[in-house]
A protein has these predicted regions:
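K/E-rich alpha-helical interaction surfaces of small helical-bundle regulatory domains
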Residues: 24-30, 69-70, 134-144
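A conserved amphipathic terminal alpha-helix motif
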Residues: 115-150
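Hydrophobic-ligand binding "helix-grip"
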Residues: 29, 36-39, 57-105
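Hydrophobic pocket/interface hotspot
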Residues: 18, 28, 46-48, 64, ...
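A solvent-exposed, acidic/Ser-Thr-rich amphipathic alpha-helical stretch
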Residues: 34-49, 53-57
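Hydrophobic ligand-binding cavity/cleft-lining segments
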Residues: 1-37, 41
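Aromatic-glycine hotspot motif
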Residues: 1-15, 65-68, 90, 97, ...
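Short, solvent-exposed aromatic-acidic interface loops
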Residues: 78-83, 112-119
Length: 150
């Protein structure tokens, strides 16, 4: 198992459009299926309720690390924190990084989630597996959101 998940997709939309879908909290909420309470700001917790069917009882909590307009967006979070009886705050978070580049057909969007080697061994493999599949789905979701199916 790797320490990182890497996914990419070329989206037939300008960088500015993909950037807005990625960093505007209302748009992010739509395609990521979460209802965020406030805009993304570096150093601030982005929190809200998951809206994906079957997971509505779970929270989305991510701390925004860096925003470089139309180029880079990152946050840290606890991967696959689905057990409401567990306090994940004592675990090291993973780092999620999005990069955007102009591409021949529009925008190349990449996501890298790293730091799985620091997740407790008892849940590392499942967190990795679930997030790997999750990022595959989310890349398709953002592409559909901006009007281009993968």
């Amino acid at each position: 198992m790797s320490d990182r998940i890497e996914k990419s997709i070329e989206i037939a939309a300008p960088v500015s459009r993909v950037w807005k879908a990625l960093t505007d909290c209302r748009e992010f909420s739509t395609w990521f299926r979460v209802k965020l309470d406030a805009p993304f700001e570096p150093g601030r917790l982005a929190a809200g309720n998951i809206t994906y069917p079957g997971y509505e009882h779970l929270r989305f909590d991510a701390t925004v690390q860096r925003i470089d307009p139309e180029r880079y967006f990152s946050f840290t979070w606890h991967p696959y924190p689905i057990d409401p009886k567990v306090d994940y705050s004592g675990e090291p978070p993973t780092l999620v990084e999005f990069t955007l580049e102009k591409a021949a057909k529009g925008t190349l969007l990449r996501v890298v989630e790293s730091g799985f080697d620091k997740i407790p061994a008892a849940r590392r493999a499942e967190a990795y597996r679930m997030n790997e599949g999750g990022w595959e789905g989310q890349m398709g979701n953002i592409a559909k959101h901006v009007g281009q199916a993968p």
